From Swiss-Prot:
Gene3D superfamilies: Cytochrome c oxidase, subunit Va/VI (1.25.40.40). GO terms for biological process: mitochondrial electron transport, cytochrome c to oxygen. Pathway: Energy metabolism; oxidative phosphorylation. The lineage of its organism: Eukaryota, Metazoa, Chordata, Craniata, Vertebrata. The keyword ATP-binding does not apply. It is a peripheral membrane protein. It comes from the Eukaryota. InterPro entries: Cyt_c_oxidase_su5A/6, Cyt_c_oxidase_su5A/6_sf. Component of the cytochrome c oxidase, the last enzyme in the mitochondrial electron transport chain which drives oxidative phosphorylation. The respiratory chain contains 3 multisubunit complexes succinate dehydrogenase (complex II, CII), ubiquinol-cytochrome c oxidoreductase (cytochrome b-c1 complex, complex III, CIII) and cytochrome c oxidase (complex IV, CIV), that cooperate to transfer electrons derived from NADH and succinate to molecular oxygen, creating an electrochemical gradient over the inner membrane that drives transmembrane transport and the ATP synthase. PANTHER family: CYTOCHROME C OXIDASE POLYPEPTIDE, CYTOCHROME C OXIDASE SUBUNIT 5A, MITOCHONDRIAL. This is Cytochrome c oxidase subunit 5A, mitochondrial. In response to mitochondrial stress, the precursor protein is ubiquitinated by the SIFI complex in the cytoplasm before mitochondrial import, leading to its degradation. Within the SIFI complex, UBR4 initiates ubiquitin chain that are further elongated or branched by KCMF1. It is found in: Mitochondrion inner membrane.
């Protein structure tokens, strides 16, 4: 398997060489070549949407989550090119409540609105789905706080 990966990387390197080929003999692969070849060769499994959602719900449902982990998780989640599902946001809001972090809860809702971008129907749908949770936890939306007018 490692030999196959080394050959693939060598073929890729040779194809990137100029039209006259390599100007000097190719070096013999050393111990670092194995590390590089493994990085060139990736065949990981793809995560389904359900697995993705379950992973993030589990992350935010950790009973011992702290404020730093909450912010780190939200920063990572915001980095993806998607609007999180309401069940993920629900878990994140409940984590905020466990931490008594009202500001982070409101910020999460602001981020969801920002991630929805020009698709004006997404944010109202998310708020509609989260309304029971927001009422239960006593969390106001940015619009209810007047933050959308600032």
């Amino acid at each position: 398997m490692l030999g196959t990966a080394l050959r693939r990387c060598a073929v890729a390197a040779a194809s990137r060489a100029g039209p006259r080929g390599l100007q000097h003999p190719a070096p013999v692969p050393g111990p670092t070549a194995a590390i590089q070849s493994i990085r060139c060769y990736s065949h990981g499994s793809h995560e389904t949407d359900e697995e993705f959602d379950a992973r993030w719900v589990t992350y935010f449902n950790k009973p011992d989550i702290d404020a730093w982990e909450l912010r780190k998780g939200m920063n990572t989640l915001v980095g993806y090119d998607l609007v999180p599902e309401p069940k993920i946001i629900d878990a994140a809001l409940r984590a905020c409540r466990r931490l008594n972090d009202f500001a982070s809860a409101v910020r999460i809702l602001e981020v969801v609105k920002d991630k929805a971008g020009p698709h004006k129907e997404i944010y109202p749908y998310v708020i509609q789905e989260l309304r029971p949770t927001l009422n239960e936890l006593g969390i106001s939306t940015p619009e209810e706080l007047g933050l959308d007018k600032v």
